[in-house]
Amino acid sequence: KGCGTCVHCSTGWQQLCVDGVKEVFGVTGHGAHAKYMKCPANTLVKLREDISFKSGAAISCGTGTAWGAIDRLCLRSHETLAVFGLGPVGLSAVMIASSMGVNVIALDTNQKRLNRAKSFGAVNILNPLKSDNLIDAIKDLTKGLGAHASIDASSSPEARSQSIKCLRTWGKACFVGEGGDVNIDVSNDLLRRQITLIGSWTFSKHGQYACAEYIADKKLKVDELFTHEWKLNQAKEAYELFDKQSDGKGVIYPS
């Protein structure tokens, strides 16, 4: 919740409020672990009948994050996108980009996640632990040039560095994973290859609407991102599993 009137709030970016965010639901304000949730009506996006509430939850956080990054990258069909980290955000990026005709290279150290990425449309999958030289492996898949764009959804310093190094000249890298650090050679990794580095944090209400419409129109199976379902009284169990970061995405039903 922002001031509601500044340049960001008035364009659907309340989380970037010039005066500072007044309330963050689930952090400084009440969250959604209840049957109902009170929030500003002007932040809501009405879901179409062909989108489940479960998919809607993903669109608001996770799938929407991927959508925001892909939108910033301005990808075209037949270009190559390398996605580092295949949690819910990374897998969503694979699903959305693949549906746009983008050739996706999906990267993760977890074979189960790599297999899911393949089922969501990734053309190639790579496990960094099984590659002697990951950058060369990506170049081998792109006629020696490198990827047109990359998304890092892992927060791993090494993956972030690789997501830049794997790009061709004029490539674009987008970081969406929170926290962590990165070590890059500004001249060789960025300037002398004309690389664009983008930071993308969430997206606007209007972006949320566009994402929901696209998913419905393309009939993307966002529900398949979810691997677990719980009731509200199972929240403790849900968070214990979540902390292990070993599975996909879960949803808690309030009723």
Model-found features: residue ranges?
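Glycine-rich phosphate/adenylate-binding loop and adjacent beta-alpha elements
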Residues: 1-44
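Mid-domain Rossmann-like dinucleotide-binding core that forms the NAD(H)/NADP(H) cofactor-binding site
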Residues: 42, 49-131, 136
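Structural detector of well-ordered beta-strand residues that form the stable sheet scaffold
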Residues: 45, 82, 105, 126, ...
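Structural motif
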Residues: 56, 84, 107, 153-154, ...
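Glycine-rich cofactor phosphate-binding loops and adjacent beta1-alpha1 units
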Residues: 73-75, 111, 115-196
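Short strand-turn motif at the edge of the Rossmann-like AdoMet-binding core
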Residues: 154, 176-180, 200-203, 226, ...
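C-terminal hydrophobic helical "lid"/dimerization subdomain
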Residues: 161-165, 205-255
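Rossmann-fold dehydrogenase core element
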Residues: 172-174, 185-224
